[in-house]
A protein has these predicted regions:
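C-terminal extensions of enzymes
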Residues: 348-390
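Shared catalytic-loop signature of beta/alpha-barrel
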Residues: 223, 229, 240-359, 363-366
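Structured beta-strand/loop patches that form or line metal/cofactor-binding pockets in enzymes
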Residues: 1-47, 51, 339-347, 387
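Glycine-rich, aromatic-flanked loop segments that form ligand/cofactor-binding clefts
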Residues: 108, 112, 118-154
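Metal- or metallocofactor-binding catalytic centers and their adjacent structured scaffolds
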Residues: 39-128
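Conserved, mostly hydrophobic/aromatic
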Residues: 3, 43, 65, 117, ...
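Metal-dependent enolase-superfamily TIM-barrel catalytic cores that perform enediolate-based chemistry
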Residues: 142-252
């Protein structure tokens, strides 16, 4: 089996005005994704998804990465990843057994493009083996607990919003704590207190600051929230401030989660060495695809850090994240978006299997296990412009 073509398709889904949420990132007006296809001479086609600006990702995939994949056997997924990662130095890197990453490919949008291609290659690989992708990765489980990820409502309205997630059956929920109606610690505490009222004492509650606070404020907020039994405080400070995040972790009893904006195992190695996190949240469509996220899972496990993949995006990204969760021993929970995300729920012919108790169950079909709807590419045609506006 050989790869014959690699292509990328930019996609968007506009958000109706009555369904837009606002955070420190701005008001969400659309969702973007890049769908990646890897075709083979066997007739099998794999699909992947990448984060990053879709037109830029598509150009990188089709004009730079495709040529490094065509002619390769997708069974050799590690080899193909190393070719994409090391670029022109891939041959000496493999011969010497030492990573020699191309300077432009270590992080950023090129790594996001590599991640998307890698997901598609693993999809083809598992299809060729005739087994679900999580089994090709090394199955640990066939279901995992999901948590409802949302929580934008202002003030006391957080009680009904988060309570609604619990009413759906989720035993863990997450809310945003910065940016909706003006940041202040008293306002954040008010919203978290309302959320706790809405979900009761037995549902886990996580909070997410989107990396928008400075260290001193993050510490003050964490200490103010400790009495509300917070399961984790996500991205308290900028993802570029690993030292600051470690300071926050040392200053609070709340576990610290982060990682959705990190690239490859090397970023996570730095977080681990600084003892900056308790829960790692790599995004499979950013951190390096299936190949690299397996390495991240093993690395974090060696440090006693749990895995909770970031899974906010298209249906392809969620499906890939689900397979990661099923194949990672240290994964304990999976993100399930509660925002308006038609590219997640309306992309495939088959529905996701999320049970009334909030557990997510893996498909038993080969590969990712999902088939694109015939009208998907037309329905989600790319729309130029930013995803968030102020």
């Amino acid at each position: 089996m050989k790869i014959t073509n690699v292509s990328a398709i930019p996609m968007s889904a506009p958000v109706p005005e009555d369904k837009r949420h606002r955070t420190d990132l701005g008001t969400k007006v659309k969702s973007d994704a890049t769908l990646i296809k890897v075709e083979t001479d066997s007739g099998l086609t794999g699909i992947g998804a990448a984060l990053g600006s879709p037109p830029i990702v598509a150009a990188i995939v089709e004009h730079e990465l495709a040529g490094e994949c065509i002619g390769e056997d997708p069974i050799f997924s590690e080899r193909i990843f190393e070719k994409m990662y090391n670029g022109s130095r891939s041959k000496p890197a493999l011969e010497r057994g030492v990573p020699q990453a191309d300077e432009s490919r270590r992080r950023g949008v090129i790594m996001e493009a590599i991640a998307g291609v890698d997901i598609a290659i693993w999809d083809v690989k598992a299809q060729a083996l005739g087994i679900p992708l999580y089994q090709a990765l090394g199955a640990v489980r066939s279901s995992v607990r999901g948590y409802a990820s949302g929580g934008w409502a202002p003030g006391d309205a957080a009680e009904a919003e988060l309570g609604g997630y619990a009413a759906k059956g989720f035993t863990a929920v997450k809310m945003r704590v910065v940016g909706h109606d003006g940041f202040s610690i008293p306002n954040c505490v008010r919203r978290v207190k309302a959320a706790r009222r809405g979900i009761g004492p037995d549902v886990e509650l996580m909070v997410d600051a989107h990396g928008s606070l400075e260290v001193s404020t993050a510490i003050k907020l964490a200490r103010a929230l400790e009495e509300y039994d917070i399961a984790w405080f996500e991205e308290p400070v900028s993802p570029d401030d690993h030292t600051g995040q470690a300071e926050v972790r040392r200053a609070t009893t709340i576990p610290i989660a982060s990682g959705e904006r990190e690239f490859t195992r090397f970023d996570f190695q730095d977080l681990l060495e600084r003892r900056a996190l308790d829960i790692a949240q790599p995004d499979v469509a950013r951190a390096g695809g299936m190949t690299e996220i397996r390495r991240i899972a093993a690395l974090t496990s060696a440090h006693g850090v749990r895995l909770a993949p970031h899974a906010w995006g298209s249906g392809v990204l969620f499906a890939a994240s689900m397979h990661v969760a099923m194949a990672s021993p240290n994964c304990h929970i999976l993100e399930v978006t509660q925002g308006y995300m038609p590219m997640m729920w309306e992309l495939f012919q088959e529905p996701f299997d999320i049970r009334p108790d909030g557990t997510v169950h893996a498909p038993d079909r080969p590969g990712l296990g999902f088939t694109l709807r015939k009208d998907a590419l037309e329905k989600f045609r790319y729309i130029d412009g930013p995803e968030f506006v102020f």
